């Protein structure tokens, strides 16, 4: 009996060391409380000769004519305006939850034509619409571009992106979105990641603090909470719930591979079983040169001939069979994979093969 209690205490101690507490607000979000996307089309003026080439972007000229006509200025028909300080842009913003009329939000401005840079430009008044084609905000202001560039004599240098910028507090909310917050007696908490264990732990924590039946786990991602009626009561109720702490168990072992950049990221739960790996590299080098053959005598009547010369080199480095020991923690996994001497691109194929062979104890996600 005493041995059983001692073993149970050791197991509970190990579980406690593996788990750590996090607030419910860091693990969940309130269903329905989210941002909405806004988009608009506008003009940027005041560019230092880096705007759209209007002969190649007719929509810029058309937009400018429409804007001038609204201001009472008529451009004669057939006029070919050669402008370099105007650019057509797309403006995007995020409409925050519970936004009120008169509140300001940030906007992102991106070039739509062939403008070289938006640095120093000013966005003219641009209506921002939602998916329902209703105008919810108006954007205008000076654009802040984070990049820099210079060109002279056919040479150019550029740091970061010049065709996009940001206007802090550049849009004013003109229309409010209706909200259903406070209308019902239940609110759903959505977990950031689907996890049956975590959903049940959040449910138990709320029931212990607010009484049995206050929360119910609907599925692996949704926890339904009974709340008092009224906005102010629900705000106070959610504030208390979101600050509750829940013991978080270890996450699922996962390896994420970015197929575009070749980066590999794994969490600390990844483990390896013993296996043997052989990786061979195949490299092909193609070298093409143009040889110019001229006649020996200047006036002999011969012709200058350009003949291409191509060399192809094929090399294959055979990879020897290397043993990978079983690894119980992340540091051991990293050391075992580094011992293979594989590049990140090779490592992607190796990890896929390890999972197929049952040696990689983790979920493999390719993005």
Swiss-Prot record:
<dbReference type="Pfam" id="PF02119">
    <property type="entry name" value="FlgI"/>
</dbReference>
<dbReference type="GO" id="GO:0009428">
    <property type="term" value="C:bacterial-type flagellum basal body, distal rod, P ring"/>
</dbReference>
<keyword id="KW-0975">Bacterial flagellum</keyword>
<comment type="subunit">
    <text>The basal body constitutes a major portion of the flagellar organelle and consists of four rings (L,P,S, and M) mounted on a central rod.</text>
</comment>
<feature type="signal peptide">
    <location>
        <begin position="1"/>
        <end position="21"/>
    </location>
</feature>
<keyword id="KW-0732">Signal</keyword>
<protein>
    <recommendedName>
        <fullName>Flagellar P-ring protein</fullName>
    </recommendedName>
</protein>
<keyword id="KW-0574">Periplasm</keyword>
<comment type="function">
    <text>Assembles around the rod to form the L-ring and probably protects the motor/basal body from shearing forces during rotation.</text>
</comment>
<dbReference type="GO" id="GO:0005198">
    <property type="term" value="F:structural molecule activity"/>
</dbReference>
<dbReference type="GO" id="GO:0030288">
    <property type="term" value="C:outer membrane-bounded periplasmic space"/>
</dbReference>
<comment type="similarity">
    <text>Belongs to the FlgI family.</text>
</comment>
<dbReference type="InterPro" id="IPR001782">
    <property type="entry name" value="Flag_FlgI"/>
</dbReference>
<dbReference type="GO" id="GO:0071973">
    <property type="term" value="P:bacterial-type flagellum-dependent cell motility"/>
</dbReference>
